[in-house]
């Protein structure tokens, strides 16, 4: 039912009947103005653009509740709205009202049909852009030029085996440079540690040495990602008509622009350096094995200066979407290890066994053999998702799309799934409320046909936190390797525990994003028998 539009029509009818039943001649002009203002306010509160979709709305407390109030409540009560919708309509479509428009939540049974649609019909990239603030997201370039994503998929992911040493080397550099000595029990804020580590490793994989350790580049890109995130959150938190004014008043947009200029200058100098070296030493020059080199080679030829600028913007856009989610996943995993301390020694023993077998070298095969850690990461992600919603898509076909059962989804609809609700459904996951760090390890061991399934970076209809199908998160394999290296090196070099009487940080929610106190500390101490990979 379209609650808002029905209410608006009733209010209009009652107002007109009231005016018709009285003599207009006896109505004071001030009363007319007040009545019109009341009418305008009611229309503003209750009007909703029809979606053309026959699906119920979750989150309404009554048919008379104004859509604007529901949209306001979504900012802080998205979790309960999504939970309510899934409980009532988990096998069918339902909708939720947000400031940026209504979104359609679909059940897993539609996923095969949806992910087989072409990007011209149903776009994953535009779904990502729309969900992160549209024109204010800072990632709109992805909709015009997807070379960064294609380079990550085709050049980086297939060559991760060659990048394992770089990941290990950069995290050890982070420990030596950014980490306290921890000779005795030392309080360490976990999330900032992971964010710094993930940023450093990402820079190494994306732009390589020496730029990845250039203070100008590191500081500018870190601030850029922070400001872009703040802008996205701010714009998602107000109605659309307020966004231009808010964007003008906030300090983050102009601070972000300054960071972009500084980062692009550093990146353009690096690209010019590489091109000059290639021209001078065309036979002896060894090209860098990083994302920047891949993007430079895959970019369409154009005017040199403009191409450098475009490539720089592509790299900054990729950097914006790369770091924070992986850092949060790592922090949650470490908190879960400490909260369920029996896993610390179990995972440490697995790491010792695996890496002693390969003479303490970090290899792709060794990371793949960390099956218990892989299971633990997947279970931690199930309990601590980075978003309550996922698999965002926008219908681009002007005629809309028709699903396998005949359901029609109109043009410009933003649709998604509810991964957290699905992976905590007792009909989908056995005993979903308990934390079993070996849940997926045991599933892989029980059935030989499941050996390649149920891994942290794989997706299926019961675990959709990375998306599903061809356009699932393109960086998930890199993120998996990063987290395994970071967590393994921490376990082998440090003892870790929580402060006395401290509890695991409890996540609240802002929109569909779980939030926790990022400064929550753990106690860490260098092990006497620490093992350096």
Swiss-Prot record:
Gene3D superfamilies assigned: Cytochrome P450 (1.10.630.10)
Coiled coil (UniProt feature): none
Pfam family, one: p450
Record has Membrane as a keyword: yes
Topology in the lipid bilayer: Single-pass membrane protein
Knockout or disruption consequences: Does not produce lolitrem B and terpendole C, but accumulates lolitrem E and two other paspalanes, IDT522 and IDT538.
One Gene Ontology biological process: secondary metabolic process
Top-level taxon of the source organism: Eukaryota
Enzyme class at the top of the EC tree: oxidoreductase
Pathway annotation: Secondary metabolite biosynthesis
Induction: Expression is down-regulated when the stress-activated mitogen-activated protein kinase (sakA) is deleted.
Subcellular location: Membrane
GO molecular function per UniProt: heme binding; iron ion binding; monooxygenase activity; oxidoreductase activity, acting on paired donors, with incorporation or reduction of molecular oxygen
Residues glycosylated per entry: 116, 528
UniProt: heme binding residues: 473
The protein's required cofactors: heme
UniProt family annotation: Belongs to the cytochrome P450 family.
Protein known as: Cytochrome P450 monooxygenase ltmK
Organism: Epichloe festucae (strain Fl1)
